[in-house]
Amino acid sequence: MTICVATGIVTSRAKKVSEMEREAEREKIHSNLLRAVSHDIRTPLTGIVGATNVLLEQDGELTQEQRQQLLRSTNEDAQWLIRIVENLLSITRIHNSEEARVKKAPEAAEEVIGSAVAKTQKHYPDVEVHVSVPHELMMVPMDPLLIEQVLVNLMENAVIHGGTSRIDVTLSQQGGDAVFTVADNGRGIPLHLLNKLFDGAARSDRSSDGKRSMGIGLSVCRTVVLAHGGTIRGENKKDGGACFTVTLPMKGDDDED
């Protein structure tokens, strides 16, 4: 009896320590996200204000080409803000749920990939996206909107920060996990960022427009994947470019013993 009680106490303490560690990690991610958001929101807003001020104050002196350029710049910054908001909504959806978990239901992974690819190609029509999926439909327990956002973030990151012209999205099953990979032929991940890609603080000075942070998007990816009980990692390919791998358990929470 004494041994059982002692074992129960140790187990209870271990659970509390593990819970405290998870909470500390969530707080760290949350803090880093706030810093990244404050930077990333300010940048496009400054661009929008600057462009519209020029249009309002110097409209009579501008050529048609200059006006079009200012309008394009404003539109791009507005689209950027929309994507930031989409990511913030994803994070809020998780943090507002109990224990930072998500409600999962079996979804066709191929359809989620297809939706993410369509959204990405709408924004970046010049980038080739090649998809490889199994012949048989893979039903994976997930929140489809959140996993779609993960895939969109990874593909967008490849374009903005990797400068890629081609993206390969692959779906496979390894043991009890569904494995999604997003690989590109771009510049790869800067070595000094490899160990902090997902903590919300990662910033690359090699983005296509020279100002966008990769911190928010990848941090959102990590938060979403962990809330699904999965894993995510990023690495450089030997032949150039980067590869991100996401694994999600094929077994739902209700199936666990």
What is each residue range found by the language model?
Residues 217, 221:
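Short alpha-helical Gxxx[C/S/T] motif in the catalytic ATP-binding
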Residues 109, 188-196:
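Short helix N-cap motif at coil->helix boundaries in the Bergerat
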Residues 96-102, 139-142:
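Conserved micro-motifs of the catalytic ATP-binding
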Residues 158-159:
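Short helix-loop "hinge" at the ATP-lid/N-box region of the Bergerat-fold HATPase_c
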Residues 103-106, 128-138:
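Conserved catalytic submotifs in the C-terminal HATPase_c
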Residues 76-82:
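Short alpha-helical segment of the dimerization/phosphotransfer core of two-component systems
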